[in-house]
From Swiss-Prot:
This is Mating-type-like protein ALPHA1. The gene is MTL1ALPHA1. It comes from Candida glabrata (strain ATCC 2001 / BCRC 20586 / JCM 3761 / NBRC 0622 / NRRL Y-65 / CBS 138) (Yeast). Coiled coil: none annotated. The keyword Acyltransferase does not apply. Its main location: nucleus. GO terms for molecular function: DNA binding, bending; sequence-specific DNA binding. One of its GO terms (biological process) is positive regulation of mating-type specific transcription, DNA-templated.
Length: 191
């Protein structure tokens, strides 16, 4: 079942299964807890899963729709700046003293406690796509950028499988650096 799922989704498997011949002749053990990463309730049936060396995938170039829409939004921003209309006027929108005092009065202990107790969500294919290409839209509003990126993601020419592979590799490695830095170091960029 597992191999069917992998072969349907990808063209090549990303791991290899090897049987342990010593345990094949014996009956399956009831509990075998010396398997790495296995709890005492799970059992090993003489299979070793070895990860193969990940392939170097090319980061696909940005979708033309994505580049066109980002250029259009930037043109809107520059035209509104030239006409004298400020997009965000912080001084009139917020009372800065209240804003700053609220953020400085929050307890540091509460902030640290909330960050340590929450689990980090695993990266999925769209999150990987969005994280990488969001750097092209620096300076745009997040809601505008999200709409543009979702349009590019749903375009038929977008290869979603490659972003799924990047996300799986990032989740498996769980590096301390961000996704963009990890991908730049482990994948080759498109021509």
């Amino acid at each position: 079942m597992l191999t069917e799922t992998l072969t349907m989704k990808y063209t090549a498997t990303k791991f290899r299964v090897r049987t342990n011949k010593r345990l094949r002749s014996q009956k399956y053990p009831e509990k075998h807890s010396d398997f790495l990463g296995c709890s005492s309730t799970k059992s090993s049936f003489g299979l070793n899963m070895l990860l193969t060396k990940p392939n170097k995938f090319q980061i696909p170039p940005p979708h033309p729709v994505l580049l066109k829409r980002i250029r259009e939004e930037r043109m809107k921003l520059t035209s509104s700046f030239e006409s004298g209309i400020n997009i965000i006027d912080i001084e009139t929108s917020w009372e800065i003293d209240k804003f700053i005092s609220h953020h400085f009065n929050t307890s540091i202990g509460n902030v640290l406690k909330s960050k340590s107790s929450s689990k980090k969500r695993p990266m999925n294919a769209f999150m990987a796509f969005r994280t990488y290409y969001a750097q092209l839209g620096t300076g745009l509003k997040q809601n505008t950028l999200s709409v543009i990126l979702s349009e590019a993601w749903n375009a038929p020419e977008t290869d979603q499988n490659i972003w799924d592979i990047f996300a799986q590799q990032f989740n498996f490695a769980s590096p301390r650096c961000g996704f963009v830095n990890y991908i730049m170091a482990h994948a080759s960029s498109a021509p």
